[in-house]
């Protein structure tokens, strides 16, 4: 994609050419599982990720576009490029089932390592106007069960899903005055999805399109939405922020027999509030609140129990994964230890999106972790360059099924669990 000269002067376009080339390269890469709050990433940008994803009222690097585009007004001109190693551990247990061979432990770790790139660029083009571009993985989910959990009821080969979401977000911010800034980002979204080993659900009466439930290769979808942001300095040392992102329409045609509304898979609306307090020149405390509206997307929010009342997979109000809306609270601290070194730490907690009676289908998407702890640093190399690193640990969480397996599948319960370790590094250059 290109940015219109209406927004950027010719010298700025010249400076953007390497960024636009990187856009094309990054768009061609796989953007696999990348999630801690349901299937949304817990933050964007290495500096934010080191402080539990806090960013709405604490702009630190150019990836703030993904959280609050108003924040680019405080960054000047800079380029940030990062790479994350995401290592989830996901598994399931089936117990108390009456079908021979169904009970047991199943590992979804057929693929263990996921490399996730990100890129952000901002440029101040006028005293009150800044523009930018961010390329990042919004989220995703991956499971690969070499031993198919549904094998005893007709599943063939290995089982699992892979969901990838890449956002390309050009943005602009405008300073209304010294205290208040507004920002907007256009979210251009590309999604990819595949599923395999789900033959038990590819039956007449269970699916409206049984041939489009499983093993259809990779299906793609593109859509667009918008993110709005506000950043305000209300008192010395205090900043508040607010952000809202629209729903992005999506549909996986090859899996129109799996997802409700004929393959519909929208990215849900979400919004958030943030606050930061620079307690001293060295210490900053910050917090974010985020609300993700998973239940508004039928393929994600509708319960599997709709199968029992005519809501077959793929139908207009078909069965889904039964996810609930969630609230996320993020807390963090940044300490500028010296002119060279800044240290960060943070903690976040999210509601549980998966109810205990919805665990059977969520063997495929066990996004159950709720709490994670983070630490990070930035080392300033010189007046222009800096290196950032971070680590995040999502604590192990198990959701035990209660009334989770229908009698038609032999009854009993499915338990799902996950934990995550995340490592990242980024390089930033200030112009």
What are the language-model segments listed below?
Residues 3-20:
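Bacterial N-terminal signal peptides that target proteins for export
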Residues 22-23, 33:
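Cleavable N-terminal signal peptides
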Residues 29-35:
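Sec/Tat signal peptide C-region and signal peptidase I cleavage site
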Residues 36-49, 94, 100-101, 106, ...:
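Outer-membrane beta-barrel porins/channels
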Residues 39-55, 73-91:
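Transmembrane beta-strand segments of Gram-negative outer membrane beta-barrel proteins
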Residues 57, 86-88, 248, 395:
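Active-site/binding-pocket entry motifs
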Residues 80-83, 87-103, 108:
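Charge-dense polyanion-binding interfaces
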């Amino acid at each position: 994609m290109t940015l219109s000269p209406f927004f950027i002067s010719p010298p700025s376009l010249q400076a953007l050419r390497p960024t636009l080339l990187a856009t094309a390269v990054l768009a061609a890469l796989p953007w696999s599982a990348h999630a801690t709050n349901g299937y949304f990433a817990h933050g964007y940008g290495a500096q934010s990720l080191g402080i539990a994803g806090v960013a709405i009222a604490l702009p630190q690097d150019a990836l703030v576009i993904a959280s609050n585009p108003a924040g680019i007004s405080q960054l000047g001109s800079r380029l940030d490029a990062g790479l994350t190693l995401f290592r989830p551990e996901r598994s399931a247990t089936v117990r108390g089932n009456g079908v021979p061979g169904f009970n047991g432990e199943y590992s979804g770790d057929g693929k263990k390592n996921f490399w996730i790139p990100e890129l952000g660029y901002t440029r101040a083009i006028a005293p009150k106007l800044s523009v930018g571009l961010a390329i990042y993985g919004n989220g995703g989910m991956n499971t690969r069960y070499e031993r198919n959990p549904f094998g005893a009821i007709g599943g063939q080969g290995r089982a699992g899903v892979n969901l990838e979401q890449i956002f390309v977000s050009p943005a602009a911010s405008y300073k209304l005055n010294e205290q208040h800034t507004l920002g907007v980002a256009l979210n251009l979204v590309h999604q990819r999805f595949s599923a395999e080993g789900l033959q038990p659900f590819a039956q007449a009466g269970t699916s409206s399109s049984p041939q489009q439930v499983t093993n259809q290769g990779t299906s793609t979808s593109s859509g667009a939405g918008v993110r709005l942001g506000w950043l305000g300095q209300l008192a010395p040392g205090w900043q508040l922020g607010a952000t809202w992102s629209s729903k992005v329409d999506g549909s996986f045609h090859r899996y129109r027999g799996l997802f409700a509304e004929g393959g519909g898979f929208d990215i849900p609306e979400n919004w958030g509030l943030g606050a930061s307090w620079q307690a001293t020149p060295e210490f900053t405390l910050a917090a974010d609140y985020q609300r993700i509206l998973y239940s508004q997307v039928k393929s994600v929010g509708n319960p599997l129990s709709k199968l029992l009342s005519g809501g077959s997979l793929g139908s207009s109000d078909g069965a889904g994964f039964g996810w609930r809306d969630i609230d996320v609270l993020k807390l963090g601290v940044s300490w500028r230890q010296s002119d060279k070194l800044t240290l960060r730490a943070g903690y976040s907690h999210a509601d549980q999106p998966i109810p205990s009676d919805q665990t059977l289908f969520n063997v495929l998407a066990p996004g159950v972790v709720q709490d994670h702890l983070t630490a990070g640093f930035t080392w300033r190399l010189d007046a222009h360059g800096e290196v950032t690193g971070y680590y995040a640990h999502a604590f192990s969480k198990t959701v035990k099924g209660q009334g989770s397996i229908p009698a038609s599948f032999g009854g009993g319960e499915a338990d799902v669990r996950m934990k995550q370790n995340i490592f990242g590094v980024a390089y930033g250059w200030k112009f």
